[in-house]
Amino acid sequence: MTWGIVLLIVIGYLGLVVLLRLNESRLVYFPGSERRLIPPPAELQLPVQRVSIRTEDGLSLGSWVIRAGPDSSGYWLLICHGNAGNLSEFGRPAHYAGLRALGLSLLAFDYRGYGESEGAPTESGLYQDAAASYRYLREELGVAPGKIVIFGHSLGSAVAVDLASRVPAAGLILEGALTSVLERGQELYPYIPVRWIGRSRYPSIEKIGRVTIPKLFLHARADDVIPLTHGRRLFEAAPPPKTFVELNGGHGDAFELDSATYFGSIRKFVEAIP
């Protein structure tokens, strides 16, 4: 192999690294093309109240308030949804209905740049969005910290861990959680120095040790987006009290394919909150 060929390979590799760095946002965030929030199917009988939440930096976040029925437990779930699409897509309303059936009220918000929310997604921005939604629960809805359970799925698990490390709450539920975006990125692109060039970190593995409230980890065995090993490692790094539940299904359908275990685990967790 001549030096000229070696030089071309090096230049091509560096070009690929630069290209990935410049397009990092597109590789990390998948807001989708649907900007409007789609009303939930009538058969779910979800009493959705559309609200707008204002962030500290002045952005408006499209959000849903879904109150529990007469059998309310008094607890509220603050939903940090997964990465793809907005809060009304990909079967999420059915998920909300299942949670509401447990006597839980919900506040689901869209991250900046997702759905009807203004702005563009960034790591610090998503943390601000969760903090603004928590403030809305406290100040606008009058919910006490001891009645707030923070819920995060997939990328939302990192947002939820960050929030739980900074504010008082009753509990934390993580589904399909990752240790960090950088680690998952390195697994997906093993020949690229993702840990060195990545700006979006979401280092849950570094923050979970500060979360001392009760924690429930849910992870599907066949999850091919965030492998089970991520959830296990995060669980091992977390202080007690904590519970880990393995589920049948994939990254976003365990609540349907293993509904008894899924919702039964959440019910048991909430009922055990001191």
Give residue ranges: language-model regions:
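Short glycine-rich catalytic loops that host catalytic nucleophiles or stabilize transition states
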Residues: 244-250
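Primarily recognizes the serine-hydrolase "nucleophile elbow" in alpha/beta-hydrolase
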Residues: 136-141, 146-191
